[in-house]
Amino acid sequence: TYSVDYIDNDKNFQKTDFQPNSDNYYIDLMQSKLNTNHHVVMLDTPELAKALEDAMIARDFPGMADVDSSMLLFCKNVKNDATVTLTGECADEIFGGYPWFFREDALNSGTFPWSIAISERQQLLNPEIAKKVNLKEYIDYRYNESLEDVEILDTDTDETKEKRKISHLTLNWFMQTLLDRSDRMGMYNGFEIRVPFCDYRLAEYVWNIPWEMKA
């Protein structure tokens, strides 16, 4: 088994909504339970910066900066020992592990919950392009279009209906970005990444289990 960590991360780690604590505790639990031959791939900040261009080439366009380059370097290191791997990618999407499944401001945001700050993103556009592109209008259109496809049961509570909407958006938008990232960063290194949590049979089953049984 393999995991990634960063030099001085133990000294400088600061919790966020996405990562309230270090992964190391849970990695140790996994390794102890499964008794695996575990390897930690250590990366440093200069490495991440240097790999940004390769990560952009792998994706064919600018992507998620160090989120991409860290994945690219991780795959490069693991490729020294194997050509195929299983990952936990998509578990949070399938089982509702992200903070936006629980935070009221995200559930009631009226937009894609992982990108609520639309005006800040608009400022990243070239001023000439920004004059021609109404980013919020386009996002609102795609958001409402996506919600038309959400399958709701007659027995669903109001809370369950809202979480179904969030799940649908996460599976069809956010998860697709991560799958594309994994595939491109892996194959750039000749490394195949498989995602068992994304098995359609598991996804279909988990869609209808009670939320209390999810994350």
Task: Describe these PLM feature segments.
Residues 1-156, 161-166, 173, 178-215:
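ATP-dependent adenylate-handling active sites, centered on carboxylate activation for C-N bond formation
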